[in-house]
Amino acid sequence: VVLGIDATLEANRDDWFVRETIGMLRRTLARLDVSSRSLYALVEPGSCFAGTLFEIALAADRSYMLDDPWRPSAIALSTMNFGTLPMVNGRSRIASRFYEEAEPIAAAKACIGEMLAPADALALGLVTAAPDDLDWSDELRIALEERAALSPDALTGLEANLRFGIFETMNTRIFGRLSAWENLIYSRPNAVGETGALKRYGSGKKAQFDWKRV
């Protein structure tokens, strides 16, 4: 259904209403790119990560896809994933994911319209990991505990670096990296407060963080 909607949007891009709809989708997804929060996507049976909606998984910092033959899950790509909904750096999320390397982008493009199983999605580099049903809950728990062990402000900056890679624009400087590092890292109590990471560094005491990341 989602792929059919994407095809309709692509076929009618010259219509003013469709053009505005695509623009709204682009702006909405771009807000995820500059979010100060960690974003995880979970691809499970019944998920609808296809075409435009797969952009949400591509915008996430990590994506996990359940590999369970008894409860199959799948993702799918459409032409909307290849430039119609660019990030704030002007590039598609797939291009940014692969640092614009031609070979993996071409491999992904060759699979447009196909329902990709976990093994295929992982081989193409479209998801972070594809644990089986035995490891699924433990992998997610460990992933969340890893994030929770780090300063939320530091993560904001590190995640901004990973999301935009080597491609920088004025938008990413102001609303991505610069905003993260200047406003959320150097001057916040999590770094320089009495119980912050810099104050507690080398003391043997654990830093105490404010987990509100806005």
Task: Outline where the language-model segments fall.
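A structural motif
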Residues: 60, 126-127
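Alpha-helical structural elements of signaling/regulatory helical domains
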Residues: 100, 132, 149-153
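C-terminal alpha-helix plus adjacent terminal tail
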Residues: 1-56, 63-70, 109-120, 138, ...
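CoA-thioester-processing core
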Residues: 50-109
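Short, well-structured beta-strand/strand-turn elements
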Residues: 127-138
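Short, surface-exposed connector motifs at secondary-structure boundaries
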Residues: 34-38, 99-104, 123-126
